[in-house]
C-alpha cells in the first residue's frame, strides 16, 4: 500500500503520544522515523517502529532522558545517553561532532548507555550535507555467530562512512551480509536474498531470509573479515565510550539497550580547497562508473547515490508500506 509522509508521521506521532511521550519529543521522533522511511530505508523506519514501541513500553527506552557530557578532551568527548531515544540522541551526537570538527578539524563523540539509533546512515548523511566526512558505528546485542561458530557471540555493528560529494556518497553497512531488517524486508516481499545471507539448520549456505531469521545463523560480511571487523568495532566503541560491549549488553541486559556508539566528523575544507575537492571526487566517481559493465543491463553503482532517486520517487508516488506492518502500527 501507499501512504503519504504526513500520514506516516501522524501515525507515529499518535502512538508516541499515547505512550506518554511529550508532544515536542514525539513530533521530533516521528519526523525521523518518517524521513527514514521516505528515504527508502523501510527496514529501519516503518518496519522497525513496532519494535521501538515494545522497548519503550518495557522501559528500555526512557523518553524524557537527555544525553549528558562526561569527559571533554578537545576534539574528543565522551557522553552518556542515559537510555534516551536512540535516533534523537544520535542526531545530537553527530551535531556535536560537527561542532568539534569546526573548531579542531576533527570531532569525535563516544556515547555510552545508548539505544538503537534506527537508520545509522542518517547521521553520516547529516555530516556530509554540511560538507564534512561523517563516520559512525554502533555495537549491539549478540545476533551473529563469529566465523567458525554456530552460536551468536558478536554484533552486526553497522558502520557508516559518508563523503560530501555531489551527490553524497555513503556506505551504510552492517558487518553481516544483510541486516536483520533487510532479511525481514525480503521475507515480507516473498523474495529470496540475491546472494547467500546465512546458514540453514544443516550448516549449508542459504538465500532463504526466513530460515536465517529463525536460526540466527546470519553470515558475516566477507566471511571471516566481517567477523573480525565486528569485533574490533565493538572494542573501539567500548573503550572510547567506557560503555558496554556486545558481551555485556547480551549477558547483563534483558534486551538490546545500553549500547555504545561512535560519531566522527572531519572538516575537509581545512585540508583541501573546494574546487580541488570537487574535481578529485568527480574523477574518482567517473573512473569507477566508466568501467566496462559485466552486464549491459546493470549499471555500475556508487554507494548511497540511489537514495536521492528513492526519495524523489517516494515524494512523487507515495511511500510503500507493507500491509501487515501498517496493520501493526494501526493496532498500537
Swiss-Prot record:
Which parts form a coiled-coil structure per UniProt? Answer: none
Where is the protein situated, by its record's location annotation? Answer: Cytoplasm
GO MF, one example? NAD+ binding
EC numbers, comma separated: 1.1.1.130
Sites where the protein binds NAD(+): 168-174, 224-225, 304-306
Q: Which GO terms describe its cellular component?
A: cytoplasm
Q: Does the keyword Cytoplasm apply?
A: yes
Q: Which Pfam families match?
A: Ldh_2 (PF02615)
Keywords (alphabetical) are:
Cytoplasm, NAD, Oxidoreductase
Looking up InterPro entries in the UniProt record yields:
Diketo_gul_Rdtase, Mal/L-sulf/L-lact_DH-like_ah, Mal/L-sulf/L-lact_DH-like_NADP, Mal/L-sulfo/L-lacto_DH-like_sf, Malate/L-lactate_DH-like
Active-site positions on this chain? 44
Superkingdom as given in the UniProt entry: Bacteria
What NCBIfam families does this protein map onto? PRK13260.1 (NF009750)
Beyond the main fields, what else does the record say?
Answer: NAD is bound in an unusual conformation, at the interface of a dimer of the enzyme.
Subunit annotation: Homodimer.
Role played = Catalyzes the reduction of 2,3-diketo-L-gulonate in the presence of NADH, to form 3-keto-L-gulonate.
Specify the protein name: 2,3-diketo-L-gulonate reductase
Q: Which organism is it from?
A: Escherichia coli (strain K12)
Gene designation: dlgD
Amino acid at each position: 500500500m501507499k501512504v503519504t509522509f504526513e500520514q506516516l508521521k501522524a501515525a507515529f506521532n499518535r502512538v508516541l503520544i499515547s505512550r506518554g511521550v511529550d508532544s515536542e519529543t514525539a513530533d521530533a521522533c516521528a519526523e525521523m522515523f518518517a524521513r527514514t522511511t521516505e528515504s527508502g530505508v523501510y527496514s529501519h523506519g516503518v518496519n522497525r517502529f513496532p519494535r521501538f514501541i515494545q522497548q519503550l513500553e518495557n522501559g528500555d527506552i526512557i523518553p524524557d532522558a537527555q544525553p549528558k557530557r562526561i569527559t571533554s578532551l578537545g576534539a574528543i568527548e565522551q557522553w552518556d545517553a542515559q537510555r534516551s531515544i536512540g535516533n534523537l540522541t544520535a542526531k545530537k551526537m553527530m551535531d556535536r561532532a560537527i561542532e568539534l570538527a569546526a573548531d579542531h578539524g576533527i570531532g569525535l563523540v563516544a556515547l555510552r548507555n545508548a539505544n538503537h539509533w534506527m537508520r545509522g546512515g542518517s547521521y553520516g548523511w547529516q555530516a556530509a550535507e554540511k560538507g564534512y566526512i561523517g563516520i559512525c558505528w554502533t555495537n549491539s546485542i549478540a545476533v551473529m555467530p563469529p566465523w567458525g561458530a554456530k552460536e551468536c557471540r558478536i554484533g552486526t555493528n553497522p558502520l557508516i562512512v559518508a563523503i560530501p560529494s555531489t551527490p553524497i556518497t555513503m556506505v551504510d553497512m552492517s558487518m553481516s551480509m544483510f541486516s536483520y531488517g533487510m532479511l525481514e524486508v525480503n521475507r515480507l516481499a516473498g523474495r529470496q536474498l540475491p546472494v547467500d545471507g546465512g546458514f540453514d539448520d544443516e550448516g549449508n549456505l542459504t538465500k532463504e531470509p526466513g530460515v536465517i531469521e529463525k536460526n540466527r545463523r546470519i553470515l558475516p560480511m566477507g566471511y571471516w573479515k566481517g567477523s573480525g571487523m565486528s569485533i574490533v568495532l565493538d572494542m573501539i566503541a567500548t573503550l572510547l565510550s567506557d560503555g558496554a560491549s556486545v558481551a555485556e549488553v547480551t549477558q547483563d541486559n534483558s534486551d538490546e539497550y545500553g549500547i555504545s556508539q561512535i560519531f566522527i566528523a572531519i572538516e575537509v575544507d581545512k585540508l583541501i580547497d573546494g574546487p580541488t575537492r570537487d574535481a578529485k571526487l568527480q574523477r574518482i566517481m567517473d573512473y569507477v562508473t566508466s568501467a566496462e559493465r559485466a552486464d549491459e543491463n546493470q549499471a555500475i553503482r556508487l554507494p548511497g547515490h540511489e537514495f536521492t532517486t528513492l526519495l524523489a520517487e517516494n515524494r512523487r508516488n507515495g511511500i510503500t508500506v507493507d500491509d501487515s506492518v501498517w496493520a501493526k502500527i494501526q493496532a498500537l
